[in-house]
Amino acid sequence: TVRVDNIGNYPVLLFSSVVKNALSKQGEDPLFILSPPAARIDPGKSQLVRVMLADPPGLDKTRQQMRHIYFQEIPDMGEKSNQLKVNTRHRVVAIATPSALVENKSPWQTLHWQQNGHSIQVKNLSPYVIRLAPSITVQPSNQQFVLEQPYLLPGQTIGTRKSDRLTSPPSRLHFTPISNTGRAIPDITVNLAPIQ
C-alpha cells in the first residue's frame, strides 16, 4: 500500500498507473493491479493506493519482474480561467520476486562489463533486477560515462550513451549499485572483459 498526501491548498485528482518495461510481454501482462486507479484528494487529506500482485498467464517465475508505478496529480482548475497549474508525476519502482527465487543481496556481482568499440557494455547474467547509479567511471583515464538506463532486467544488455566515447583503452571501471531499498552501495571496482 502506498499513501499519497495532498499537502497543497487545492484538491487534486490522483491517477495511478503501471508502466511496462522493455522485457514485458508485448500483450497485456497486468503484473500489478492498483486500487483505486483514480481518486480525488482534498487539501490536507491522504489517499491509500493498494498495489496488488497479479498472476498473469505466461509469467516467467524463474526471475524477478520490474514495473514502474506512476502517481500523477491533476490539479483542480477552480473558477479562475487565467491560472497556471502544473501537473506532477512521481515514479516508484516495483519489483516482484518469485517465491522460489533465493534472495541475493548483491546481484551486481554477476554483471559482465566489457568494451564495445568506443563505448562500454554491461550484461545482467542473473535472474535479478539490478539497479545502478547511471554514472560510471572508467580507469585509468578517469573518464565518466552515463548508462542508457539506471537498471538491468534479467538477461538484459545495455550500453553507455552514444555520445560517450572512450579516449584511451580501459582496464577497469567503478560503478555504484543501488540496493533493493533504493540506497546507494559504496562504489564497486571491476575489471573489463577483453573486446569481443
Residues covered by each model-derived region:
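Short acidic, flexible loop segments centered on an aromatic residue
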Residues: I7-Q26, P127-N142
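Intrinsically disordered, low-complexity Pro/Gly/Ser/Thr-rich segments with frequent PxxP/GP/PP motifs
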Residues: S24-P57, S141-S168
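Extracytoplasmic
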Residues: N9-P11, S46-L48, Q64-M66, R89-R91, ...
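Soluble periplasmic/extracytoplasmic beta-strand elements of cell-envelope proteins
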Residues: L13-S17, L48-M52, H68-Y70, V93-I95
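Intrinsically disordered, low-complexity segments enriched in serine, threonine, and glycine
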Residues: N116-Q196
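Terminal connector regions
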Residues: P56-L101, K105, T167-Q196
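Beta-sheet-dominated interaction scaffolds and their linkers
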Residues: T1-D5, E103-Q115, Y151
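Buried hydrophobic-core signal for structured, non-transmembrane domains
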Residues: T1-D5, V51, R67-Q72, S119-N124
